[in-house]
Amino acid sequence: MKRSLFTAFAAFLALAVVATDYDLNKPFGFCTRSSRTDANSTYNVTGGGCYTYPIPSDFTGKVIVLKSNGEDMKNNIQNAIKQNDVIIFDGSNGDFIVSSNVNVKGDNKTLLGINNARLCTQFHITPEIITALNNAGVPHMNTHEGGGILPNGQRVREEAEFNTRKIIIGLTGDNTESYRKSGILRVAKENIIIRNITFVGPGSIDVGGNDLVSFNGAKHCWVDHCSFSDGMDGNFDITQSSDFNTVSWCTFSYTERSYMHQNTNLIGYSDREPTGFLNTTFAFNWWGPGCVQRMPMIRVGKIHMLNNYFSSTTATNCINPRMNSEVLIEGNYFEKGVRRYYSQNDAISVTWADSNHAEEPNKAGQPISIGTPVTVPYDYSVAPYADVPAAVKKHAGATLKK
């Protein structure tokens, strides 16, 4: 079922730069469904009751506007989310600093950024740390075995992780390794909307640390027009039976701050993830500079990859369907220099549509469809692949304005 849903236009939206008809500016895709097959099983994603700015004058929910105080704001943010329906992050006072993951407590919440709101981890990888890791030869160490016992008594299985953590303990003097908790949001609730926020992590590094943003059992959530960079473990992972979520118009990237493990998006934490969950739509997203793998790597769920843009020339694998996954891949654009953009391992079904476009051949072999054709239970249309680069580069990320 492919009707012209993407030609709709939400004229009421004030917080928007809508110069492309492809941006619906409202929840769509799997987040609006309660079944992976039944189109009549719908869900009304409302968040805290509003996802636009300015807030409508007749809105009766609880709203709070947060500004940075220049210090660790984890508790401030966590309490604001707990006590309010709509949480507005106003970036006019600078970055919001967070020491470790903020747990989103309570269903039916909207988190909305204005004035270039950035949520940043307190810890970050420094040039001194990177130099020490290089001098020790960490990039050439084993990532499967050969570990040891750290000065704090912790046993580590892998050689690269062991030496990385040992070096950071030595440089920082932090035997508790609190830096490994560097992340920003953890969501395990229902009906959550996150829009127009930039999330900045400490830099990717192989220490078994936190993701920048993680969905652990989150359901019916819409993440739209956000930017993710330099997550320690992943930029945005969706696991632990999360279900019916949509990620749209977001950007994923890494900077020189990141060192190893630039694995951006994981769907399903392992092959043991329970089946029947993790149904997710990715539409009009941009996997850009520095991304190496997991764009996304997919286990278990039914995943719709629609009109996404891939430009990372460092990629060793972009879309990677794996155990028990069903994946529909349509209208995506792989830029020149992206030479390893698809492989699959033990997927149930993959539909690789003719509407995808790659500037270069895939070094892992020409993608092909396997299994039963994959369908999704909602209306949509596929934008021409030629429109994708310009539309996504201009409008994806935290680009909405007042």
Located regions from the model:
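Extracellular "leader-to-stem" segments immediately downstream of a signal peptide or signal-anchor
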Residues: K2-S4, A19-V86, D95, E128-R157, ...
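Hydrophobic h-region of N-terminal signal peptides that target proteins for export
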Residues: A10-V18
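Right-handed parallel beta-helix
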Residues: D95-G276
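All-beta strand scaffolds that present successive hydrophobic residues in beta-strands
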Residues: L111-G113, I168, I192-R195, C221-D224, ...
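Residues in short coils/turns that link rungs of repeat/solenoid architectures in beta-rich domains
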Residues: G201, D230, Y254, Y259, ...
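Low-complexity, polar/charged sequence tracts that form flexible coils or short amphipathic helices
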Residues: F215-N216, F228-S229, I238-T239, S258-Y259, ...
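Oxyanion-binding "anion nests"
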Residues: R294
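Extracellular beta-rich repeat passengers
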Residues: M297-K402
